[in-house]
């Protein structure tokens, strides 16, 4: 809650519809940043406050807005964002002048951030899914000594990127580059078009990374765009293998299949990664590597997969195979997350119902 009546008044004013005739009032009230009015909005799911201006039109969390205000040594906004609920400790991440550091400490910040607090800050800011937030987090944090020297963060980022790094060795790149790749991957995961274009324009040499993330995070629209725009060094079967590592990647599995990837290898990869949904899709698409898949499932003592693979009445789904398209719009409709269910999965579940008298 705002700590003063003035801060509360500004907060209420910032939530109102803005007209150009009101700009002079907002500027006098301190609701002005980068030559434009400040407005606040709330996220739909967790009701977090998002600060918006012309420069950050998709919105920043209060804490990220605070970090930017501290970097700019904008004391009025530092006080305002703190009164609106920002954690003043976040300001220590970007502080660059003694007078601003003194203000942060006056507002309640500690003298220095512990390694655990730095880690907490990173994971606090990473989850807000707006282009403005992702881009600014990259600009403020990717080359920030507090984060570059955090051993715990290095281990966690290494772990998150390791599975995706099919054509690079993480040991051979700097942590700064790892963080850049991480924020790029978040833009693709959350399907943030403007953030994706920001990274694509500034890091054109990461084109393979964009494609990898599009495959792994089931972003068939971005995968299609980059695959048709750039020459890639990644084999189509490598792309399919990556898609099959994450259950539910139906659109990118289908896309790779239509480009000619080996669907039997995809089936085997799905079993190796215990991805039941992907396995059924591969069967729908004509995969028949049952012998090899049963051997893998048996070695893992995975009786759920073994029983699925022992069922004999599977057949390809002609409705999937007849379309033969790489159009992401059509693929997305065909494999809609809420509507699509594998024909062969339904057949298998029906067989269990007849045996046990209950749905699985």
UniProtKB/Swiss-Prot annotation:
GO terms for biological process: taxis. It comes from the Viruses. Plays a role in virus cell tropism, and may be required for efficient virus replication in macrophages. This is Protein MGF 360-1L. Belongs to the asfivirus MGF 360 family.
């Amino acid at each position: 809650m705002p700590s003063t009546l003035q801060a509360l008044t500004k907060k209420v004013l910032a939530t109102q519809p803005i007209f150009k005739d009101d700009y002079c009032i907002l500027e006098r009230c301190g609701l002005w940043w980068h030559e434009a009015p400040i407005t606040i909005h709330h996220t739909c799911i967790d009701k977090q406050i998002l600060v918006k201006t012309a420069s950050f039109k998709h919105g920043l969390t209060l804490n990220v807005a605070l970090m930017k205000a501290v970097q700019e040594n904008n004391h009025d906004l530092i006080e305002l964002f703190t009164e609106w609920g920002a954690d003043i400790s976040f300001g220590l991440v970007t502080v660059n002048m003694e007078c601003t550091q003194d203000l942060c400490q006056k507002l309640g910040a500690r003298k220095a951030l512990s390694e655990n607090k730095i880690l907490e800050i990173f994971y606090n800011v990473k989850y807000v899914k707006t282009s403005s937030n992702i881009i600014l987090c990259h600009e403020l944090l990717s080359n920030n000594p507090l984060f570059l020297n955090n051993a715990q963060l290095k281990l966690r980022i290494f772990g998150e990127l390791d599975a995706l790094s099919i054509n690079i060795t993480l040991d051979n790149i700097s942590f700064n580059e790892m963080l850049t790749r991480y924020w790029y991957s978040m833009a693709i995961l959350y399907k943030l078009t403007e953030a994706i274009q920001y990274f694509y324009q500034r890091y054109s040499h990461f084109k393979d990374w964009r494609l990898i993330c599009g495959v792994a995070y089931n972003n068939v629209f971005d995968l299609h765009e980059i695959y048709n725009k750039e020459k890639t060094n990644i084999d189509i079967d490598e792309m399919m293998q990556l898609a099959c590592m994450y259950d539910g990647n139906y659109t990118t599995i289908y896309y790779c299949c239509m480009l000619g990837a080996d669907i039997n290898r995809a089936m085997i990869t799905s079993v190796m990664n215990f991805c039941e949904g992907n396995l059924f899709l591969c069967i729908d698409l004509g995969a028949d590597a049952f012998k090899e898949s049963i051997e893998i499932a048996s070695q893992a003592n995975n009786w759920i997969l073994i029983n699925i693979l022992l069922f004999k009445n599977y057949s390809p789904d002609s409705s999937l195979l007849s379309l033969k398209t790489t159009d992401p719009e059509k693929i997305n409709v065909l494999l809609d997350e809420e509507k699509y269910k594998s024909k062969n999965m339904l057949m298998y579940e029906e067989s269990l119902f007849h045996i046990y008298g209950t749905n699985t």
